[in-house]
Amino acid sequence: MSKNTSPADGAGTDPQSVDAAVTSASTKPRISVIGTGYLGATHAAAMAEMGFDVIGVDTDPSKVEALSQGRVPFFEPGLPELILRHVESGRLLFTTDIAEAGALSDVHFICVGTPQRRGSHAANLSYVEEATRKVAESLSHDGLIVGKSTVPVGTAARLREIVAGVLPAGVSADVVWNPEFLREGHAVEDTLRPDRIVFGGTDVRSEAILREVYAEPISTGTPVISCDLPTAELVKVSANAFLATKISFINAISELCEAAGANVSTLADALGFDDRIGRKFLNAGLGFGGGCLPKDIRALMFRANELGAHRAVGLMQQVDEINMA
């Protein structure tokens, strides 16, 4: 199931085999998106914009009602208009009925939250596990379950076991991973025109399906990286950990600049001209916050400690401590 590939062509699977599998598909896959928060609502709208019939699923009836009217409970430029356009066209609908989505759809994106556990650095995976289980139980035909939520490494393998235990007789489904890389304020653009696409744990059939789903950005040159499940799970959290490290680095250097009489802003500008470093995330004084970076590096610390990767734990502890100072 796992494979490694260069970013240039994205396929550890034989490209001719993938192309043949895509060609053999008679109709576009129908898509469900489980969870309609920031990630899910954006992904559902973008999939509809790419020409797919999409069902967005959420357990909150008030959220489903609002989205069905094009009202988005958070700020993201362009998203309300995109949702309303495709709700009115009939291409996008929202429901609380996950069984309906499972029965009617072919590709199921898991986009539920993975908050930090109360009193722990670990990620709360109950929403991901429940959503995946319910989708698998409701399948009326063979399907593909695609994780997009940010999860600790090893989660997808466990989800495969859960799915295998609850699938209806005669139905098959695989679990693969396709992490998101959204920036607040640019989520619609980042979904429609991503700077890279990662597929984790795909075989010929599942990769062909995902390449059909993402055919539009792939056709414009977006690189595809096809890899094993653990690598795909680690890509997003590692990216966030690196950005957090960059922020904590410049804040640590800011202390040195203050002690030495140096100008940290000028120093950051000078560093930024080095294309190996870049200027982004080098603004001293502003620590990282929000809903992703803090919880993601703490979940990474927790999982790294479970796996005995103590240097990663130590590095992330320093990053977190500098940020909290």
List each language-model region with its residue ranges.
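Structural/interface elements that position substrates and couple domains in central-metabolism enzymes
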Residues: 2-325
